[in-house]
Design a protein with these regions (language model features):
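ASCE RecA-like P-loop NTPase motor cores
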Residues: 1-315
């Protein structure tokens, strides 16, 4: 961790990291014999402030980062200079922890009124945000650009996350509205992430973080069955009893946020189209570029981390 700074506020955490190896990695036991590593670990555990480690190659840095994560068993963020470095470090850390996650930077808007972001990128960012909101001790790699970008507050993401179970009583139209409010696009057929459709007595939805869409079948107002299905041939593959469905956008809008946006854009003639979309209950394509109008607080990825998280600047 050349010029690396590690900031921590150590507390005990009994929860095991998702994907964390329960057996001691032999490569970590090698570090246990190092006096320098022991001092680094003791400094972090003793809350003695930032620590610096110098003169290491990239493979050595990721080795130490993985070892620190294995000791801490709490969220750890590794910040790197660029997207290319993030992809490289993430790949190396996955050799130790296959469940390490990459938090990419949001794509830049084409112009003031156009904003295009791939569903895959949105999926990665929301999946990481959801794990941090739950308090999972996950290992996150992010370029500095991603760390500095504004985000919606964790409470907004949580508010628009739906946990759907068999036996749940809810009107199909009401559940469909919840999905649309969370940023899902209503289509005639559900074929890609972020889409939802109502077909007879069932709702098909392709969760933004899922590999396959889900068919929710109703008996009157009760969810009778839920089945994953192949988006290509629309055939069911396997049953499921519970599905967590994250919002399909990083900026789902509740009523108050929507009204704030309308009020802020009302006097701006060149945003008339966005204002009309908001009034109609939709989410403008360029909503993320207008995020400060909807969210007043300066929220970034750092606000998703608990106070005792480890933050490593890998330069």
């Amino acid at each position: 961790m050349e010029n690396a700074a590690v900031n921590s506020n150590m507390t005990n955490r009994e929860t095991e990291a998702k994907g964390l190896n329960t057996e001691i990695n032999p490569l970590f036991s090698i570090l246990d014999k190092s006096e320098e590593f022991r001092r680094l670990q003791e400094g972090l555990c003793g809350c003695k402030g930032p620590a610096g480690v110098f003169g290491l190659g990239e493979a050595q840095r990721t080795h130490i980062e993985a070892a620190l994560f294995s000791k801490a068993k709490r969220p750890m963020l590794v910040v790197v200079p660029s997207e290319q470095a993030a992809a490289r470090v993430h790949e190396e850390l996955c050799c130790y922890y296959p469940d390490a996650v990459l938090f990419p930077a949001r794509e830049l808007p084409l112009n003031a009124h156009s904003y295009v972001q791939s569903q895959e990128l949105t999926s990665k960012r929301l999946r990481t945000a959801a794990r941090l909101i739950k308090g999972e001790p996950c290992l996150v790699v992010a370029p500095i650009e991603a760390v500095m970008q504004r985000m919606a507050p964790p409470s907004v993401i949580s508010a628009f996350t739906q946990t759907v179970r068999t036996g749940m009583v809810i009107e199909p139209a009401s559940l469909l509205k919840k999905f649309i409010d969370a940023g899902y696009s209503r289509e005639e057929m559900c074929e890609g992430r972020g889409q939802v459709c109502l077909r007879g007595g069932c709702i098909d939805i392709f969760p933004i973080t899922a590999e396959n869409p889900v068919r929710i079948e109703f008996f009157d107002d009760e969810i009778d069955t839920m089945r994953e299905f192949d988006p290509l041939n629309q055939r069911s593959t396997e049953n499921t009893d519970c599905v967590e469905i994250l919002p399909a956008t990083e900026l789902p809008l509740d009523r108050d946020m929507r009204q704030k946006g309308i009020a802020a854009l009302r006097s701006k003639a060149h945003y008339a189209a966005e204002t009309e979309i908001l009034r109609a209950g939709g989410i403008p394509q360029n909503a993320l570029s207008l995020l400060p109008l909807f969210v007043r607080n300066e929220i970034t990825l750092l606000d998703y981390l608990p106070e005792d998280a480890l933050i490593i600047l890998d330069e």
